[in-house]
UniProtKB/Swiss-Prot annotation:
HAMAP family: Hydroxyl_YbiX. NCBIfam families: PRK05467.1-3, PRK05467.1-4. It comes from Cupriavidus metallidurans (strain ATCC 43123 / DSM 2839 / NBRC 102507 / CH34). This is PKHD-type hydroxylase Rmet_0838. Pfam families: 2OG-FeII_Oxy_3 (PF13640), PKHD_C (PF18331). SUPFAM superfamilies: Clavaminate synthase-like. Its EC number is 1.14.11.-. 2-oxoglutarate binds at R170. Keywords: Dioxygenase, Iron, Metal-binding, Oxidoreductase, Vitamin C. Fe cation binds at H96, D98, H160. It comes from the Bacteria. Its cofactor is Fe(2+); L-ascorbate.
Amino acid sequence: MLIQIPNVLTPEEVRYCRQRLESSNWVDGRVTAGDLAAQSKLNLQIPVDSEVAQELGEFILTALGRNASYHSAALPLRVLPPMFNRYEGGMTFGTHVDNAIRTVPGTGGMRIRADVSSTLFLTDPDEYDGGELVIKDLYGSHTVKLPAGHMVVYPASSLHAVTPVTRGARWASFFWAQSMVKDDGQRTMLYELDLTIMEVRRQLGDDKDAVLALVNHYHNLLRRWAEL
């Protein structure tokens, strides 16, 4: 399931993030890649233990906390602190898969299962050429290049890549979540059912037996599938 979520950050919030990142120290992005992924990775990142990464990570987590679409799509149990990357001057990240298990920084070794990947764009498409996020699934390849402040959410099990940036610079935040429902097919069904419930409520109101029955069905499925 690949879901685009608009306006996770407002234009003012994007500008604030950009201003903080512009004056920060960037390092070789390969320091956070696995052995295989590092062979195809060429980008810059903000060190995860830096003050700006921690500040802006909390800033983005706060924005996620008020975004109902993200919670409906990801059903997050735990979210790793957001990270920040930059591609420019031919930088790219070849096709790779994310590590299934990731260590939470600053916890002394606590680990989470990476079920859901997210990329939050911090530059508009007209600011750079190339830099498309290409996500592969059973139905083919999907190319994603969204306005600043918009986000794409997709299964962490997907093969994906970032095409070379040939003009300008592509800035983004990226992070992973452990979902309450680890199976992507089950998450997709719950997400689509949630959307259906919202539409039925809009059309019929909340005082109909059909609405209550659908809500009951949603929560019983979540109760059956969730792992806490």
